[in-house]
Amino acid sequence: MAEEEPSSVSRDLQELQRKLGLLLESFQNNSKVVAFMKSPVGRFLDRHPFLVLTVLMFVTMSAIPVGFFLLIVVLTSLGALMGAILLEGLVISVCGLSLLCILCGLGFVSLALSGITMMSYVVVSCLMSYWFSPSRPPTQQHANIDSQLAMKFTESEKLGL
């Protein structure tokens, strides 16, 4: 049994080598591959197989980390964009409500000041018209003052002043 295993393994390896050779030959006989290998880039790659293998391995191994990085960048950008929109909406809403409260307060203050000013104007104008009206009936106090002034005037006339 031990002798049967190496012969079957060697047969399997030979079969695998034959299949890989056919696959490689089909790639090399492909018209697109032939056209690429005749280009300057293809000739450079044919002259530097180690560099090609290194670049191919680097690109293959870095595809997953670069993909994750780009995914994180896109998700972070979308999150920041949504966050900025939400933050901007929140700031605008808070500022708008603050402005509304301030304007309502200023409206009430201006209404109160207008009312006080109008009441003051009415009271002062009524008092002014009452005090300085020529047709106003004399009050007792004003009558006493007027009579005292008249008496002083008549006394000064009597004395000849």
Curated annotation (Swiss-Prot):
GO terms for cellular component: endoplasmic reticulum membrane; lipid droplet. Residues 62-67, 111-116 are lumenal. It is a multi-pass membrane protein. Residues 1-43, 88-93, 134-161 are cytoplasmic. It comes from the Eukaryota. The chain crosses the membrane at residues 44-61, 68-87, 94-110, 117-133. InterPro entries: LDAF1 (IPR029709). Coiled coil: none annotated. Pfam families: Promethin. PANTHER family: LIPID DROPLET ASSEMBLY FACTOR 1 (PTHR14275:SF0), PROMETHIN (PTHR14275). Plays an important role in the formation of lipid droplets (LD) which are storage organelles at the center of lipid and energy homeostasis. In association with BSCL2/seipin, defines the sites of LD formation in the endoplasmic reticulum. Interacts with BSCL2/seipin to form an oligomeric complex. This is Lipid droplet assembly factor 1. It comes from Rattus norvegicus (Rat). The lineage of its organism: Eukaryota, Metazoa, Chordata, Craniata, Vertebrata. The gene is Ldaf1.
